[in-house]
């Protein structure tokens, strides 16, 4: 019997603009058992097709050689819930020249929160991933507080979070975030790839900046994360509500989409809640190529 679920997934062709002219783009890879995330510039090999065209990806100078490594290239836009879109391809990087790689899409995933809809799920759908979780009050080291990190956390609204699986497969996703007690909090599903990866390998890399298309400044943050079952503490929830829903400039957008709220609540209710708690260790300024 078919089961109806709410999905954010769309055809890659529906996000053609993210492929043809990405507002910001990033690359994630496992570089010798270390997760790496970099700002990149991306163009499509001619004839340009948003789905099948190889991506020509340029990375900043001074980074590890990515030739013949499996990579993830992600483009995203929109700090508001109903405008948050992402187009992700996975493939192998082939060297073309200095700091430039050709990536043929082996897998492509597109999602658009503004296009939530009900779809039928065929029988035999895989069981959701099961991950181990940390205790909500688990002790960790004191977080880092460099001035450039404080500025990035204050000025950014969507971070790129990169993680790696136990087998070394890189994964990257744009996420909302808030800070509390010197740590970075992000909500997600308990069955998400991010939760599974963090449980297997706590090291993460974050990329901030670039939400303004004209801004080439970025901040690369390295640290470690833990996955906690359930919603964040009330103080964190309040910060999320204020930062993304209740501020006047965002409350207006929310009210314009009030008819979609019920669908959004059903989408959230389909999976168990979890949140990621990130402790920063280093912060390095860089520029998009």
Where are these regions (language model features)?
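Short, conserved active-site entrance elements at the starts or edges of catalytic domains
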Residues: 2-28, 131-170
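Short beta-strand segments
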Residues: 16-62, 156-190, 205-209, 217-220
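Short histidine-centered beta-strand/loop micro-motifs
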Residues: 60, 85, 170, 186-188, ...
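Short secondary-structure boundary/capping segments
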Residues: 150-151, 196, 266-268
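Short alpha-helical
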Residues: 193
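Helix-adjacent hinge/juxtasegments
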Residues: 196-200, 205-219, 226
